[in-house]
Amino acid sequence: MTHSNDSMTRRGLLGQALGVAALASAFNSAGQLIAQTPEAARIRDSFDFGWKFFKGDAPGAQQPGFADTNWRNLDLPHDWSVEGPFATTEPSGGSGGFAPTGIGWYRKHFRLPASYKDRKVSIELDGVYQNSEVWINGQYLGKRPFGYISFAYDLTPHLNAGGDNVVAVKVDNSLQPASRWYSGSGIYRHTWLVAVNPVHVAHWGTFVTTPRVSKEAAGVRVQTRVRNERAAAATCTLTSAIVDGDGKVVQTADISQEIGPNAEYEFEQQIAVEKPSLWSVATPYMYKLRSTVRVGQQTVDEYETPFGIREALFDADRGFLLNGEHVKLNGVCLHHDAGSVGSAVPERVWERRFEILRDM
């Protein structure tokens, strides 16, 4: 089975923490950095707190000096459609729950220490519905059509080191009817601020597969994309460590490669795990791939990818086999909202849904 870091970043389901190192800093409700450890190889912070929101269009709201004092204060995730008012005259129609849609704006003020100036700083958005556009300090970063995929933007060239920074997000769900189900509106999933060194594992840069699986041994294939954003070539050493559920390193592999300036290289490693604990529905055992990148003796990045070791096979005569055992697949009609909470669904709701599916 395959495991990319992308699929694990979106909700952090069932408590699988995606952070590479411990969260090295945090933002308070006012968007101020309240702690920092600049020596960390990688920093990944929740960016959910201290946002301002306006329901409706607000021309010029992308500019850092725009007056947002009277905007509503809130934390993410957020779905404005579920807040109503609901009316049969809403263009979303019956399939959209007669919910209000339209345009909404989000703004967040934040400050970073001057020590971040040598890092690449990105914003990651796990889901915005829909047709979002993002600015940093008045500079346009891009548009994400539709609204279910996660995406990221590089903030680095436009940041004010040590000064005030403003992220603005315009969400446009005004083209209605647009769905055969309730979609919600807004930044309905988590947001993150990520700071890395110039040499680092690329965004969603790991891909883990388990092409050979048995109770005696498993072959783990690891593909890792490392970027060098320095102006000179760098000889990089990648250490891939497989860590079990108790935090014990069960196997490691090292590989080195010179990567040219402003270039990217994909490493490939084959790692054997003896007597693996197999992932199954009854016992969903998880390992972690810990990727450490060094240039010389300096650790420049650390990155973790959760994965399970299992074999999945579809057979015309025996049906679906998981680790060689027949498993009956049950399906349900499930959309991404959760009733009265709309599309900004708490993780525990998703966990409970999976528990019900497991017990069917």
What is each PLM-predicted segment?
Residues 103, 162, 217, 260-264:
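Solvent-exposed, conformationally flexible loop/turn segments
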Residues 1-9, 20-22, 26, 34:
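N-terminal secretory signal peptides
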Residues 12, 16-20, 31-92, 166-170, ...:
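Accessory carbohydrate-binding/adhesion or oligomerization-edge regions at the termini
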Residues 219-257:
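Beta-strand-rich binding/interaction modules
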Residues 57, 96, 101-204, 229:
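Accessory beta-strand-rich segments of carbohydrate-active enzymes
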Residues 252-275:
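Intrinsically disordered, low-complexity Pro/Gly/Ser/Thr-rich segments with frequent PxxP/GP/PP motifs
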Residues 118-119, 159-164, 274-286:
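Short glycine/proline/serine/threonine-rich loop/turn segments at secondary-structure transition edges
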Residues 82-112, 116-124, 130-135, 204-206, ...:
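Active-site-adjacent substrate/metal-binding segments within catalytic domains
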